[in-house]
């Protein structure tokens, strides 16, 4: 009886979509693009490095708003609205005290008007009204980065939730005057939701559902733009004992994230993305609301695959999981898997 219970439990664990073979960094479940279909996934490593220590400067940041048909899942496409053709939009890095010039160009082929509202801005609409651009137009404004932190930006053209759900969000980091402590690896991860008329898992080109958007019932949850985007070739990679920093944000537009890395504990959490308050320490899971962000740091002492999830775990089966693959020597003093004595007894 005991053996049967153990066997049943083992089978159930293996069946979990974010376990066993699904944890491999070489997993091919990441959406594969076809001819005429864009790869909208923003690599978690696609972010500029730390700024050199310097005084305030004038910094120009340009955005192109592009509407593209992209791969949402294998055999499934969706019409995305994007900043620079990827989801999330580009990671912007400036310094406290910088004067930042934002220039937004709406692509000639766009159907919709677009703009940008940056939560780092002190001024009306976060720049949204100043950058409202019809297809083919360019708009710009400047602002002074007054307060350090990690901030969400997004399109704020009505219907705002629709523009965000279709992929128009990103992060801007305002480094404090002295910069941030040096780390070995930095990653850029954002969570979002996609609302389609068709049920999750449907093949072909899907259409957005305003009804489901208003009811807050997404068919897909995504990291960096697509279902299971941060797996396979897009898995995050690190070495044992490296200090890892993740800049994490939630575009939403509606759902709060309980961000967690299975098998790890966050050594530091810059809660609510405040870079001036003392960080929390030894945290298992963080709560990040739509339009919010956080910065987490940790070391992976033991090699292997670590799974990025929202701990509302049903969402993993709708596309919300990623892999951090850590390479290095085994650490049996920290983590040791006992031999399968049951299997040995039957041989």
Where are the language model's segments positioned?
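Gram-negative bacterial Sec-dependent N-terminal signal peptides
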Residues: 1-22
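Copper-binding active sites and cupredoxin-like electron-transfer domains
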Residues: 20-347
């Amino acid at each position: 009886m005991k053996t049967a219970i153990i066997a049943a439990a083992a089978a159930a664990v293996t069946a979990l979509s974010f376990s066993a073979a699904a944890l491999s960094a070489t997993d091919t479940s990441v959406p594969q693009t076809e001819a005429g279909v864009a790869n909208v996934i923003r690599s978690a490593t696609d972010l500029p490095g730390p700024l050199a220590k310097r005084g305030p400067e004038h910094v120009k940041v340009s955005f192109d708003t592009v509407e593209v048909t992209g791969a949402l899942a294998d055999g499934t496409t969706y019409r995305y609205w994007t900043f620079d053709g990827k989801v999330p939009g580009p990671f912007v890095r400036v310094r406290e005290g910088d004067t930042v010039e934002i220039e937004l160009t709406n692509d000639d082929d766009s159907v919709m008007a677009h703009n940008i509202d940056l939560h780092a801005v002190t001024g009306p609409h976060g720049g949204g009204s100043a950058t409202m651009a019809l297809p083919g137009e360019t708009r710009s404004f400047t602002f002074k980065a007054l307060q350090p932190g990690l901030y969400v930006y997004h399109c704020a053209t009505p219907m705002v939730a629709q523009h965000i759900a279709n992929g128009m969000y990103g992060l801007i980091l305002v480094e404090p005057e002295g910069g941030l402590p040096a780390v070995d690896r930095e990653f850029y991860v954002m969570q979002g939701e996609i609302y389609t008329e068709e049920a999750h898992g449907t093949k072909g080109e899907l259409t957005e559902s305003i009804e489901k958007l208003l009811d807050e019932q997404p068919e897909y949850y995504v990291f960096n733009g697509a279902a299971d985007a941060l797996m396979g070739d897009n898995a995050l990679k690190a070495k044992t004992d490296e200090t890892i920093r993740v800049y994490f944000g939630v575009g939403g537009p509606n759902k709060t994230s309980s961000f967690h890395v299975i098998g790890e504990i966050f050594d530091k959490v810059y809660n609510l993305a405040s870079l001036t308050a003392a960080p929390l320490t030894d945290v298992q899971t963080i709560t990040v609301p739509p339009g919010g962000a956080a910065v987490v740091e940790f070391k992976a002492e033991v090699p292997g695959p670590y799974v990025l999830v929202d701990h509302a775990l049903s969402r993993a089966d709708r596309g919300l999981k990623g892999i951090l693959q850590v390479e290095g020597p085994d650490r049996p003093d920290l983590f040791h898997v006992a031999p399968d004595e049951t299997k040995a007894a039957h041989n």
